[in-house]
Amino acid sequence: MLHARIAARAFNTPLLVEPSKAMAFLSGLGPRILGRRVELADLPVVAGDLGAGALPARASLLADPLSDRLRQQGDAPYAMVDGIAVIEISGVLIHRGSWIGQSSGQTSYEGIAAQIEAAAKDPAVRGLALEIDSFGGEVAGVFDLADRIRAIRASKPIWAFVAEHAFSAGYALASQADRILLPRTGAVGSIGVVVMHADLSGQLDQDGVRVSLIHSGQHKVDGNPYAPLPEAVRADIQREIDVLRFLFADTVAAGRGGRLSQEAALATEAAVYRGMDAVAAGLADEVTNLTRGFASFRQALGAPSTSKLSRAFSASHLKPKKEAVMASKKQPHDTPHDTDLEFVEIT
């Protein structure tokens, strides 16, 4: 199997992503990761020609946290508009990434946490605006970050602005804001969990390759890609993701308060809701042009109108310079290549 680190984060592990992204992942990167054609729903998927790119180095969650480095450098890791810290959450959401903003189609939970914590401690920040456009990402790290966002809103108002998509892990974070605003075409939801399993046994048989797994422990090689998925293992995975779905719904309910209960979140059955349907279902609070919605946030804070509203949602102003906050030590030998991880969120 090629690109083992990517495969390990994409297959046989629960992810909070919108299902269509799983199809995009398998279509675009599946053949390159697995080293052979991928068949999905009886349809062959052929390898595409994707560019190669290196990812930033990882950072420890316990030592030298990213937020400490930001304070030492004295840089504000967010755009500021009339006392509002604008924090972009876009692309694939991943665990353990030591950078701010989007990099190679990814945004890290660690980076988002550093931004919101810095904003919470900054006396110049009167409120936080989460600008979200994401189909989701990894389960690991998302619920802890959701809890941190919910805790911070007790001291500073937080509004979520859905810049078209807040699905799965993206919605887990959006739901922790005081208010969720989206445009007419914006969509939210996908409160569910998905796991992908790759069965390479048929292709290996055709290639004359037989893999023997010598292991100690009955469940040590459960879900391995060299054999069809046994029903007992499938049932174990199903139980695991069902538990995670309940945790997901409970987290959403904690963030939404009386607007969406855990039972109602589960009753969505991971559906997505667009525009007014999202408001009617309790997954969002208002359908509006995001520039007008941002003006409403400023008005609610009593901030003076000292800058153009269009700046709030202009990519040239919103994206922090990640070069200033990259990890100081890179590890090229530990860096995956040949991937646009815009797709890895999808499993």
Cite the ranges covered by each PLM segment.
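N-terminal organellar transit peptides
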Residues: 1-347
